[in-house]
Amino acid sequence: MAGRGKAIGSGAAKKAMSRSSKAGLQFPVGRIARFLKAGKYAERVGAGAPVYLAAVLEYLAAEVLELAGNAARDNKKTRIVPRHIQLAVRNDEELSRLLGTVTIASGGVMPNIHNLLLPKKAGGSAKAAAGDDDN
């Protein structure tokens, strides 16, 4: 009867470990799995799908927060507000393409002045000024 019986130290119950901590994630794998099942996206949901989706969502959130934090620091602020998220997303090419149709509430608009509305250069070109003297 090899293999039967209690192993040494098996008296202590195993501590429960969440799927998020097993995967080394902060986002809730169990909750995402529940949403995937309740959403009827498919008849069945694989065990790895919610882990992968949680990792992707966590990465995107970290990316946006890092860029928004940089935007807040550039504006000499210590708190991230929707304006900083808007500036971060719209200044990043890939995030802007991903969230192109998304409206960020209280985000404002991107600063942009059309070139025709900008004042003319005061100095101009030296050749043009010299050419006018000959006439």
Swiss-Prot record:
Pfam families: Histone, Histone_H2A_C. PROSITE patterns: HISTONE_H2A. This is Probable histone H2A.2. The nucleosome is a histone octamer containing two molecules each of H2A, H2B, H3 and H4 assembled in one H3-H4 heterotetramer and two H2A-H2B heterodimers. The octamer wraps approximately 147 bp of DNA. One of its GO terms (cellular component) is nucleosome. The keyword DNA-binding applies. It is found in: Nucleus; Chromosome. SUPFAM superfamilies: Histone-fold. InterPro entries: Histone-fold (IPR009072), Histone_H2A (IPR002119), Histone_H2A/H2B/H3 (IPR007125), Histone_H2A_C (IPR032454), Histone_H2A_CS (IPR032458). It comes from Oryza sativa subsp. japonica (Rice). CDD domains: HFD_H2A. Belongs to the histone H2A family. Core component of nucleosome. Nucleosomes wrap and compact DNA into chromatin, limiting DNA accessibility to the cellular machineries which require DNA as a template. Histones thereby play a central role in transcription regulation, DNA repair, DNA replication and chromosomal stability. DNA accessibility is regulated via a complex set of post-translational modifications of histones, also called histone code, and nucleosome remodeling. It comes from the Eukaryota.
